[in-house]
Amino acid sequence: MCGGCVGTEYPERGTTCLEGGSFLLNFVGCARCGRRDFVLLGNRAAGLHGDDEIITYDHLCKNCHHLIARHEYTFSVVDDYQEYTMLCLLCGRAEDSVSILPDDPRQMTPLF
């Protein structure tokens, strides 16, 4: 992975967890060939680790195939919530939690 290709290493992305794609605003250009072009996705793998679904892939320079970053996305169900995480040098770090119930108990206001 190459810190010279990105503007900010592991930027904080809040709840934006990407299952695919790239955060191109953080790509400053390839440290090897010096070009700023599209980013290819390679070596994509999806599988289960216990009850977690994990998707990994590499961000590669379109021109010289230099490895910019490795991307990891996870999905799991914990209690009544769908949990998402993302960790990537280029795309950043993020977490999200969504209730599987029609009404999210965390969003309900107490009556008293």
From Swiss-Prot:
Binding site for Zn(2+) 3: 59, 71, 88, 91
Residue positions binding Zn(2+) 2: 30, 33, 61, 64
Gene: CHURC1
UniProt GO molecular function: zinc ion binding
Keywords, comma-separated and alphabetical: Activator, Developmental protein, Metal-binding, Transcription, Transcription regulation, Zinc
PANTHER family reported in the protein's UniProt record: PROTEIN CHURCHILL (PTHR31931:SF2)
Similarity comment: family membership: Belongs to the Churchill family.
GO process terms (BP): fibroblast growth factor receptor signaling pathway; positive regulation of DNA-templated transcription
Organism lineage string: Eukaryota, Metazoa, Chordata, Craniata, Vertebrata
Pfam families (alphabetical): Churchill
Origin species: Gallus gallus
Binding site for Zn(2+) 1: 2, 5, 30, 66
UniProt name for this protein: Protein Churchill
Function: Transcriptional activator that mediates FGF signaling during neural development. Plays a role in the regulation of cell movement. Does not bind DNA by itself.
